[in-house]
Amino acid sequence: MDLDTITSISTPMGEGAIGIVRLSGPQAVEIADKLYKGKHLLNDVPSHTINYGHIIDPESKEVVEEVMVSVLRAPKTFTREDIIEINCHGGILTINRVLELTMTYGARMAEPGEFTKRAFLNGRIDLSQAEAVMDFIRSKTDRASKVAMNQIEGRLSDLIKKQRQSILEILAQVEVNIDYPEYDDVEDATTEFLLEQSKEIKQEINRLLDTGAQGKIMREGLSTVIVGKPNVGKSSMLNNLIQDNKAIVTEVAGTTRDVLEEYVNVRGVPLRLVDTAGIRETEDIVEKIGVERSRKALSQADLILFVLNNNEALTQEDYTLYEVVKNEDVIVIVNKMDLEQNIDINEVKDMIGDTPLIQTSMLKQEGIDELEIQIRDLFFGGEVQNQDMTYVSNSRHISLLKQARQTIQDAIDAAESGVPMDMVQIDLTRTWEILGEIIGETASDELIDQLFSQFCLGK
């Protein structure tokens, strides 16, 4: 593939120990040699070596930076192109100057995700693996990163390719029977054969979809909203779960005036914890904005932690709030058990019915383990599945698998109703195409461009 040479800073902007300028393309080594002065020309050193030297401004002859330069030659690189990585000191000024020099002498500034896009276009990875690279970068827990790494390694791709190959074998068998019915040595593509094979493919698609809910939680985190009247201990609960003091905790009702969000790993389940402003009528403009954001967070939540105050009797406000959330996945928490009990637990149980109930003291850190176990049990049946299994975690993949399941079902229905084989082929072919979109073999250029535009610069 005839592409130009791209360049970008591939480390986070800001001061640090090192900063890396990455080049990829046919002129990567040549451009670097125009700037680099060391013991040997980079063009003469072996691949996959690191070389000490300096970056020199060819025009002024000024020493710009002391560097270590990695030389990686095609095709055994991430992009399958020549790659140069210039390791600089981590100052913002010098690394930007090195970047500018690479562009002055022939490289083009890379677009977001363009290095990974080239890896895809050059056949190094498929589209699902490319998407997993971004998932890996954005992962908030060990489990999420492991799920992403499994996809980078191609586990999902292998399963998709296997099903596409099975469909091709069915189509080939049907095609031969239609075009060459006189051949005695060709196995008959009977309706029974087609149904058996198609149902096996559908079963495998269903198996992948069965991992979708948990996979999406692994990837995005379980959106968990902490809700309750003002000053029942919601922010203290957030702080105990994340072991941090991000939320403001005071004795004044209404001090959480916005939606605070944090990721935390709870017994293998990644939670995206959201502490909301108390939902109540208020004249305070700032607090009113927080209340509206809280309502929006509630509507998008996977799990709601509904907090009550052990020190106060149930009020109409508690009943009203519970009415808002009762049809969702809810765990009710009676907090502040270290204080005098003024709440009627039996009244609470009458209000919530079979909804799980946990009693806690955030001040004494009591009941937190029980709460964490209840969260795990509610979504993973008491056991978080093996992180080495193949999860489908990407919403795009889940949507396409659902479409593929429908089209393979259409093929099954058509075959069972006696529709001619050449008509059944249409649904089988469409299933093959949809599965191909997951790994990028039948994806449009527009989709590919859109997906890679979401990547960070330098990746």
Curated annotation (Swiss-Prot):
A GO term for molecular function: GTP binding
Protein name per UniProt: tRNA modification GTPase MnmE
Coiled coil residues, start to end: none
UniProt keyword list: Cytoplasm, GTP-binding, Hydrolase, Magnesium, Metal-binding, Nucleotide-binding, Potassium, tRNA processing
Pfam families: MMR_HSR1, MnmE_helical, TrmE_N
Cofactor-binding details, from the entry: Binds 1 potassium ion per subunit.
Subunit structure: Homodimer. Heterotetramer of two MnmE and two MnmG subunits.
Name of the coding gene: mnmE
Residues of the TrmE-type G domain: 221-380
Organism: Staphylococcus aureus (strain NCTC 8325 / PS 47)
